[in-house]
Structure formats: C-alpha cells, structure tokens
C-alpha cells in the first residue's frame, strides 16, 4: 500500500504460443532510455551507506536523480497523484506503456497501445490511509483481491487498444514512441476488444505466482515491436532477470510459464530441464534428421518480424522529439481537479519535505516551475524554500478528462461497510441494512468491543467479525451506526469507537446513522454538517456524505441514500484548504 507505480502484467496462453503484456498502472515511465534503468532503480532504493529508507522514494538520492534527469517530471506527477495509492488492485487501470505494432496478414502494420479498464472504475486511498494500512495490514491489497474473488466478486477489466496508422506517426506534438508520453484518449480513442475476468484464486501461490516469468519479448504472430528505446532494452532485461531469478535457462518450462500449444526449439540441457528430447540433432540446418527441429514458416504459423524500413545512422542518441520533458507534465496537471491537485501538492510536501539537502529541494521547485508556476509556488510553501522568482510553465492549455479520477465509474459492488454495534443494538435496523446492502453487492462486518456475539434489544444474537483492536476504519469504505440506546451508550463511552467514526469522516468516507446512532456523530466531534433532528420526519438527511435518519422503522429510503453515497467512493468537499493555492 506504499506510494508506488504498480505492475500490471497478463500472460495470454494462445493457440500460437504465449503472449506477455507486461505493463503498469500508469501509462508512462520515468525514463526514455533503457540504459538508465539501473540508475533510476539505484536512486529510488535505500541509500547504500545506511540502507534507509525502505520502500520509499522520500529521500535525497531519488530526488537528486529527478532534478538531474528532467524526463522524470511527467511520471513523478502521476506517481504523486492519487494513482500512486490505489484503493484496490481491482480499481486500477493497466497500461502496456510502450508503443507496439499490430501487423495483419497482408503485412500492413499499425501502431498500438494496450489498456486495461477496470469495470469498478479507478479509485484511490488517501495518503494517511495508505500510511496506516502499511502498518496495520501490509497485505491489504493482496488480501482484498483474494477475498473479493473468494466471495464471488470477480474483478473484471476490459481490454482496449489505441490504434494509429503508421502514416500519422508525426501528426502530434509529442513523439508517439517516447515512453514518458501517453496518447490522450480524446485524440486517439480506446477501442474495447475483450474482457479479463479473475474468476478463481491460484491453488498454490508459490508455484503459480512466485514462479511466473513475464518476458516482454513473448509475443505471437501479429504483434511486433517498435523503436521505443525503453522497449528495446526491456526485450533483453526480462530474459536476463528470469535467468537469475528462476535458476537457469529453462524457466519457460515451469508449468505456469509453459505454452499450452507445442513449441519446439534447439534449446538443450541447462539447469532444471523438464523436457526429454529424442534424436541426435539439436541444431539447424541438419541432414541427419531431415532438418528437424526447424523454425516454422509463416504459412505454418511461425513468427515473422515486420519488415520495417530503416534509414539513418545507428547511434546511441535520442531523437530531438524526445527533448520536451514538460509539455505533457503540464497537460496532466491541467487535467487534474482541484482536489487531485491538492493531493499532488500534499504528496510533494511529504516526499520532498524528507529530503535533507536544501539545494535539492530548491532544484525541485525550479524543475516543476517549468511545468506550472502555481504548482512550484505551492510546493515551495511546504518544503522550506523560496518560491520561484520567474514565471514558469510551458504554455500548454489543453487537458484530458480521461486521466482525472473524478470522471471514473462508480459502483457499490464489493464495497465493504463496518457496522459499529454493542449489546442492545436495534435488531430490525441492523438486519434491514445488512440484507438490503447485500442486494447492492456490499459486504458488511460487525465491529464491537470483543469477539463472540452481541445481543439485540430482542435477544437476537449477531456474530462479531472484528474488534476495535483488529478492525480499523482504513480497512472499510463506509460505516453504519445503528440505533439502540444501550449499544449507542457503550460506543459513546469508547474512545476507540469514537476515533473510528471521526477517522472515517476525516478520510471523506460515507457514514450512515439511524435513530439513536445519529447521536454518535456529535459524540465523535464531527461538526459543520446537518443531521436528522429528533423532531424530523422519517426522511434521510444527506450532508457531505453523512446520511442520517430518525423516527424510522422502514429503512428503505435511508438504505437507498446510504448505498448511493457509498458508490461515490469519497466526499471530497469535506477536505479543507482545497482552495489554498488555486
């Protein structure tokens, strides 16, 4: 749950062999040239003299790399945005990052970028949540994915492609082969071509997950590569990685990596060989076995590379079209809502605020002043350096609504609600909420002082799922506070319960409360919102995502409003100081 770019890789077992789509949850990368891979990794990892910090980029060497390699500016904004702390693997996009080629049977090629679009929409945590979850449950994302699949809430992603004719390669103000740039969906729409459903968990995590070997060069006929310099390096590096990680050259024969269609080659021996080859030959061309094995021809379904015309000198130098490091960074910044911009600024304050070198902090402001002047001023205000003295920015005015999470899908499906209750809870209220939320695809867990059961006012027993020691507000999407005088009194006297409620509100999540449960809102010191009064009719009141109702026996209208609020994910208008810099 730490802030980072996430991998998003899929292995296709096709009739023509294995195709690995090895991507990330962000459509671009830090660097343009694969030669810089070791450098960016070394800079981001713990500093070698003290092996600190672990799993964090909030330190001097990473930001020293950023200010001296400004091609990173665009990616840094994506990582410091809410995209860097996804709510769930089920709620993040996937991207192939690079530009590939699709080649038809006639040999005609088109440029393509691959996308995975989650059907649940793209949603994120807030930074404080991510920090707490890293300590409370380091396995949060893995557990969330596993539990959702076990419960039958199968994660689904639509596979989409952006396709560009080769003759339009130079039609844009960015180089389409630059891995630090993305293709705006408003210019090149994403066409949906399929759907991925994760409908079961693995049987053995080590055998099927730890041993899986993704390799960018694993493609099938019809898919080919481009001159993206980062892609060219990855074609080698993944093979090199698997040779070491999985103990030798035969990693592709491990069951999870093995092609389901027959694949024949001249590879022999080596550690962990799993195929017993017969015959005297292991080379081509040969006459002893009638040239068997041999590569398949195109007619036989063999792989044939695209016949690309090449003209020019072969040198290690990037095209001048790669030299613009800031225009798309500005474009991304323009595309963010004020809420999202504030979150990026807050992330800068945390990350760069942990940099000890004042010179590097000053240079961060200088670099991002070239992206946007107001952004640079806002960064400077929180890291103890002077704001830029000269106007900055690139002059780019455009934006892409598709990259803002404010324009994503919303759903209640597989959302998780904590119900805070003690002995004396109102049975009818809690039962109606649990049963009807289930119809919306919402799961519920009862949180109480101790494990076991609690009794309602009528003596009905409810199983307690978590206590205030094992269940935290950051593990849920919303909370519900049912009525029942005795239950509410016990919760009101419990500091952990009140903290649970207040923290849920602080993180902009939905809160629902009925009858006496409404009193807990004020007890938790949540002010500035409207709540149902004791004299009000049995109609729900919605104030900034806090749904309250009194004098109600039929909870239908309340549950409807509550579920709609849960689907919105967060209620960002609660956040204060959003207009501080805008």
Regions found by a protein language model. Give the residues of each.
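Catalytic nucleophile loop
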Residues: 357, 448, 478-484, 497-523
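Active-site-adjacent core segments of small-molecule enzymes
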Residues: 1-427, 431-439, 443, 448-469, ...
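Charged helix-capping and loop-helix junction motifs
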Residues: 463, 493-499
């Amino acid at each position: 749950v730490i802030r980072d770019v996430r991998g998003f890789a899929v292995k296709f077992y096709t009739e023509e062999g294995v195709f690995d789509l090895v991507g990330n949850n962000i459509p671009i990368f830090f660097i343009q040239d694969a030669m810089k891979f070791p450098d960016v990794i070394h800079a981001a990892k713990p500093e070698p003299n003290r092996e600190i910090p672990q799993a964090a980029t909030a330190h001097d060497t990473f930001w020293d790399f950023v200010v001296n390699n400004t091609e990173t500016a665009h990616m840094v904004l994506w990582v410091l945005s809410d995209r860097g702390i996804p709510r769930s693997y089920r709620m993040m996009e996937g991207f192939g990052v690079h530009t590939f080629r699709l080649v038809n049977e006639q040999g005609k090629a088109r440029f393509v970028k691959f996308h995975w679009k989650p059907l649940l929409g793209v949603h994120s945590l807030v930074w404080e949540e991510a920090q707490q979850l890293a300590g409370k449950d380091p396995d949060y994302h893995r557990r969330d994915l596993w539990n959702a699949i076990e419960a039958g809430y199968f994660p689904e992603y639509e596979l989409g492609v952006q396709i560009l004719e080769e003759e339009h390669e130079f039609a844009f103000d960015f180089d389409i082969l630059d891995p630090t740039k993305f293709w705006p969906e408003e210019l090149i729409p994403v066409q949906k071509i399929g759907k991925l459903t994760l409908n079961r968990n693995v049987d053995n995590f080590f055998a099927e997950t730890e041993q899986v070997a993704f390799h960018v060069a694993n493609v099938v006929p019809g898919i080919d590569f481009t001159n993206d310099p980062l892609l060219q390096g990855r074609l080698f590096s993944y093979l090199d990685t698997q040779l070491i990680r999985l103990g030798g050259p035969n990693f592709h024969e491990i069951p999870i990596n093995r092609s389901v269609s027959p694949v024949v080659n001249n590879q022999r021996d080596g550690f962990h060989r799993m195929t017993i080859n017969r015959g005297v030959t292991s080379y081509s061309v040969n006459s002893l076995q009638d040239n068997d094995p041999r590569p398949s021809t195109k007619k036989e379904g063999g792989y044939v590379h695209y016949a690309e015309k090449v003209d020019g000198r072969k040198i290690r130098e990037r095209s001048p079209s790669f030299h613009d490091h800031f225009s798309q960074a500005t474009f991304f910044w323009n595309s963010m809502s004020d809420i999202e911009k504030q979150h990026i600024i807050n992330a800068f304050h945390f990350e760069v605020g942990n940099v000890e070198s004042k010179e590097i902090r000053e240079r961060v402001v200088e670099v991002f002043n070239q992206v946007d002047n107001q952004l640079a001023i806002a960064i400077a205000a929180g890291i103890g350096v002077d704001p830029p003295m000269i106007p900055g920015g690139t002059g780019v005015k455009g934006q892409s609504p598709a990259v803002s999470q404010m324009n994503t899908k919303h759903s209640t499906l597989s959302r998780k609600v904590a119900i805070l209750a003690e002995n004396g809870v109102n049975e009818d209220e809690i039962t109606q909420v649990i049963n009807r939320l289930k119809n919306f695809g919402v799961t519920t867990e009862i949180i109480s002082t101790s494990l076991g059961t609690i009794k309602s006012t009528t003596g009905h027993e409810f199983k307690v799922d978590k206590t205030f020691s094992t269940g935290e507000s950051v593990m849920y999407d919303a909370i519900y506070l049912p009525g029942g005088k005795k239950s509410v009194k016990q919760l009101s006297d419990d500091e952990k319960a009140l903290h649970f409620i207040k923290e849920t509100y602080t993180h902009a999540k939905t809160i629902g409360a009925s009858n006496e449960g409404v009193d807990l809102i004020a007890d938790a010191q949540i002010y500035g919102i409207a709540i149902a009064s004791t004299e009000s009719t049995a109609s729900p009141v919605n104030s900034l995502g806090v749904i309250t109702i009194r004098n109600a026996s039929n909870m239908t209208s309340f549950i409807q409003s509550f579920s709609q609020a849960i689907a919105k994910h967060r209620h960002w208008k609660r956040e204060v100081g959003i207009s501080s810099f805008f």
